[in-house]
Amino acid sequence: MRQAGFWFVAAVLICAPAAAQQPFTDDTVTQLVMAVLHQYFDSPSMLEVSVSGAAQVGDLLIVQDLLVLGKPAVVHGLRGEFLLHLAGVEVELAALTSGTIKARRVQKATVVAKSTSAAIQEALSRWSGSLINPRIQLQNGSFTVTAILRRDDALYPTVAHGALAVVGGQQVHLVLTDVTVSGSNVPVDLIGNELARVNPLVDLSKYPIRLFVDRLVLHNDGIELLATNIKK
């Protein structure tokens, strides 16, 4: 149903006669934005969209101001919440037919997102079937994970300490600084395989608006992230 809604709105926009400046109703643009957003978020997500100053100029859809609130927002099983503000957005109408919208221009983009240790803990269980009963503790700037890793019929109690790292400006990775694995004949790739399943924890490059991590804070209550369209 989401894809059907997307193509309906796309058809309405593409078939509209090109004019010097043609207004769009808030409802039309909201449907378009919601259809695009639902391609990137899991079904439990609750999204609210507010649009103002939308118009067609030639082959462009221009939105002066766009706010999106996701509470909760779920991405690949990781639950959190976010607030997105976009100003001065220009989108090519022809790009709607591809189903993957890339904005031609965004004057300003700001995203504030956060998640909790409980949500991360739940997501770890979903991401890896070999990770049994993971428990995560967050401290200022670091974390500790305790879990049992399963490989075939063997079980390996594990304690790992680490931090979060920004990679390439757009990804957030779990980086381990110290790992203790109990058991005999521990496979050399045991930890590496688990990290490969988890990382990247966040990947902003997958979204239609270019965003870069501006600030990443890890504290006792959870994780907070600030992203903008300005690359440092």
Model-flagged regions — what are they?
Residues M1-W7:
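Bacterial N-terminal signal peptides that target proteins for export
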Residues W7-C15:
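Bacterial N-terminal signal peptides
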Residues A18-A20:
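Boundary at the C-terminal end of the N-terminal hydrophobic targeting segment
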Residues P23-S52:
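N-terminal amphipathic/hydrophobic interface segments
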Residues F41-A118, S130, L138-R151:
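N-terminal beta-strand/beta-hairpin edge segment
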Residues A160-A165:
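Hydrophobic/aromatic beta-strand elements that line small-molecule binding cavities or substrate pockets
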Residues Q171, V175-F212:
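Extended amphipathic ligand-handling, pore-lining, and cofactor/metal-binding catalytic surfaces
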Residues V202-K232:
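Long hydrophobic alpha-helical segments typical of transmembrane helices together
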